[in-house]
């Protein structure tokens, strides 16, 4: 294909600086090519072979905020592919859905985001840093919608954290099993829980499962939003917290776990404490981004472990990440009490993780399409994230073209 030194591409009018049409009919995408003379230079030409004028649009040179995080996620994904052999993450943002077609590069100008079409996405919230971020962002909006809906009716939302004792030698799979049993008893299984929810008028809840790692090994725990139909003032939740601890302690011991301490086993935030917490982090953020965000020095999230492996190459860290992944793979991260999702979202059904990552933006437009061999060069050089950033930074095509040229040179498909 490269014997004639041309690289077939497809580009949208908007991507080339051409004014958008006002017609309701979709505008046909004009053809253009990226051409090289073999010296390492690449430039776009129109369908007649004339040099394509690239119009500079200052509004399309976007702010850098968030771009570095995107780069970092794709770099981490490259490491995950090496650690989790045989898992779906190996195909994520790497292989194409239709093996006979290239990869489209899409851009949503209003959201300042670029994405790919015809690319596999693993939807693995536990092991893929790229898909986990996409899923978490969507779940965050769902949780915020529920909180806003409830507060608009005069209710309050409290944050409950449930933990159990654990040690560095604890069998993580058994701990997960016993913790899940205790959680089920607390919310569904014992008369004391039913009385507790009735006494304190807890009408709905959203729970999130999270895990960190520290000196005492893996630390799985739950964050739960409790929806009550009244205002919760300063100190007024203390009685509720005491009642909850008594029930939680009983649920743990009956599930084969050690008795949790009153200081560490259960924590309830309400009133000013909760308000300050929400102002700093956002409850919806805490509920959905637990293993994506960076933890404290003494308490690392799974992706902190992955970052450490990326920086040090220490196989002990890779082994630790694998242990975490295979212990919690398939665990549901977010659970809603019956009926809450439909009530807060006006009847909309909850999307699966796969539906979230596969949901392409309806208003995004294709800037250009990557030939199969070009995509192979980009993925071989691990530049999938870099290309999305280049497009988001500059839709005039200068940065994306230069990045593509570099990938082809480094892959031995062009001469420098």
Where would I find each of the regions flagged by the language model?
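Right-hand nucleic-acid polymerase module
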Residues: 1-218, 228-416
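Cys/His-coordinated zinc-finger cores
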Residues: 224
């Amino acid at each position: 294909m490269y014997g004639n030194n041309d690289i077939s591409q497809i580009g949208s009018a908007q991507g080339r600086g051409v004014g958008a049409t006002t017609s309701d009919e979709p505008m046909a995408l004009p053809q253009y090519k990226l051409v090289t003379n073999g010296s390492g230079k690449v430039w776009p030409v129109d369908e007649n072979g004339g040099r394509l004028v690239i119009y500079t649009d200052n509004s399309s040179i976007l702010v850098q905020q968030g771009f570095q995080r995107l780069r970092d996620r794709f770099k981490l994904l490259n490491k995950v592919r090496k650690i989790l052999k045989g898992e779906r993450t190996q195909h994520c943002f790497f292989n194409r859905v239709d093996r006979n077609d290239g990869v489209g590069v899409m851009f949503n100008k209003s959201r300042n985001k670029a994405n790919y079409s015809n690319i596999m996405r693993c939807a693995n919230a536990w092991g893929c840093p790229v898909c986990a971020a996409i899923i978490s962002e969507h779940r965050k909006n769902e949780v915020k919608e529920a909180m806003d809906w409830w507060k608009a009716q005069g209710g309050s939302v409290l944050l409950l954290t449930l933990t159990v004792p654990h040690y560095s030698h604890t069998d993580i799979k058994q701990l997960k099993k016993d913790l899940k049993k205790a959680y089920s008893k607390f919310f569904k299984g014992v008369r004391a829980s039913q009385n507790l929810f009735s006494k304190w008028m807890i009408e709905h809840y959203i729970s999130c499962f999270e895990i960190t790692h520290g000196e005492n090994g893996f630390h799985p725990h739950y964050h739960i939003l409790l929806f009550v139909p009244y205002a919760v003032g300063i100190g007024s939740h203390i009685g509720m917290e005491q009642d909850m601890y008594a029930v939680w302690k009983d649920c743990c011991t009956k599930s084969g776990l050690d008795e949790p301490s009153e200081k560490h086993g259960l924590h309830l935030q309400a009133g000013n404490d909760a308000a300050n917490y929400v102002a700093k982090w956002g409850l919806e953020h805490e509920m959905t981004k637990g293993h994506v965000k960076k933890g404290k020095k003494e308490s690392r999230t799974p992706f902190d472990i992955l970052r450490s492996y990326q920086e040090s190459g220490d196989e002990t860290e890779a082994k630790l990440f694998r242990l975490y992944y295979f212990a919690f793979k398939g665990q549901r991260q977010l659970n809603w009490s019956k009926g809450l999702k439909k009530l807060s979202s006006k009847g909309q059904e909850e999307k699966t993780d796969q539906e979230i990552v596969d949901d392409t933006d309806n208003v995004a437009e294709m800037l250009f399409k990557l030939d199969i061999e070009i995509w192979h060069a980009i993925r071989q050089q691990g530049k999938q994230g870099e290309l999305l950033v280049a497009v988001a930074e500059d839709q005039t095509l200068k940065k994306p073209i230069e990045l593509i040229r570099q990938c082809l040179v480094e892959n031995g498909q062009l001469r420098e």
